[in-house]
Amino acid sequence: PRLIADVRGVLDRHFWEEGPGLFCDEWNRDWTPFSSYRGMNANMHGVEALLAAYEATGEQVFLTRAGRILDMFTARMASAHGWRIPEHYSADWQVDPDYSGNPMFRPAGTTPGHSFEFGRLLLHWWDLAGRPGGDAPANARRLIERALDDAWDPARGGFAYTLGFDGKVAIPARYWWPVTEAIGAVAMLLKLDPQPSDEDWYRRMWRFADT
C-alpha cells in the first residue's frame, strides 16, 4: 500500500491530466517541461498499472481512470481510424499523423501489437467492472480482429511491427512480443466472448510461437 500510494502521488502531481482523463508522457528530472508530446503507449501501460492497483487495493479511482483511458483510445480514436489506434498526439490530444520518432520505441503509423494489448486490457477492465452493458466486448474484438487481419504474415507467421494509417505494412519485422500479446488477447476473447474462429487463431499463433 505504501508503494502504491507513493507512486499515485507522483502520477497525480505530475502526469495525470484530469481534463482529458489521460497521462502525459515526460518531464525533466527537476519536473520542468521536457516536450509537448503525448502518446498512446504511456497510457496503455498506465491502464495496466491502474488495473493492477485496483486489484490490489479495491480503490474505485484506479478502475475509473483506466476506463477513461480505454474509452479515449478504443471507443473514440480506434473507431475513427478503422479500428487501428494512432500512437502519437499533440499536447491537446490531437492525432499527429506526421510524427516519426525512434523506429523501435516511437515508430510512425500504428502498431498492431498495441491493438492486441488494448483489446486484452479492455476485456480485463470490463470483467473487473462487473461486465457492464455497452460496447466493450465488441470493441475489443474489433481491435483484435483488425490487427489479426492487417498484420499476420500468412507465409511465415508472426505479425508485422507497424502499419500505415491505411493498414498497409510499414515495418515488416516480426518481433516476439506482438505474437505474445495476440495470444493473450485471443485467450481473453475465448474466456469472455468466444467465437468459433478464436480457437483456430489461438492454436495457429501458438504453433508459430513454438517454432
Residue ranges: model-predicted function:
Residues 1-211:
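Glycan-recognition and catalytic cores of secretory/periplasmic carbohydrate-active enzymes
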